[in-house]
Regions:
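Amphipathic, Lys/Arg-enriched alpha-helical "gate/interface" segment within cytosolic domains
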Residues: 2-137
Length: 137
């Protein structure tokens, strides 16, 4: 993420592995919640999704830009069900969301999550492309 920076305090080292995966970053002067599911197994995916929802729910409605990276993530049935419910629960807080890293069978899960949540989350081939789209007015 070339022109992006993490918006966090120096206590980064004290963050849990889950909290390190869900952080606000800044891209071209705009705040984006980066939810990093990359290489997560099903258990970690659920924990990351829960942390993402916790942070989103602290923000005003329809205010948050989100970037979700699912590169190399693996899912089980329970994780998919949980992810569907979290994406739906996050909807009131998200102004715009994007996804990167969708490959192979992940496309089926991506379509199922969108259908269940009734949200359209465009997918991009790179984080940079997604960030550019998110911050455009």
């Amino acid at each position: 993420m070339n022109s992006s920076q993490v918006l966090s305090d120096p206590s980064q080292a004290t963050l849990t592995p889950v909290a390190r995966r869900v952080q606000f970053i800044e891209h071209l002067g705009k705040k984006v919640l980066f939810i990093n599911y990359a290489d997560c197994g099903a258990t970690m995916m659920k924990a990351v999704a829960g942390e993402g929802h916790r942070l989103l729910s602290l923000e005003p409605p329809n205010s948050v830009l989100t970037l979700n990276d699912v590169t190399g993530a693996t899912f089980d049935h329970e994780a998919v069900a949980f992810l569907k419910s979290m994406v739906a629960a996050n909807a009131p807080f998200v102004r715009r969301g994007a996804v990167v890293g969708i490959n192979g069978l992940q496309s089926l899960i991506y379509e199922a999550v969108q259908a269940f949540s009734r949200r359209k989350l465009p997918q991009f081939t790179s984080r940079e492309q997604a960030l550019q789209w998110l911050v455009q007015d």
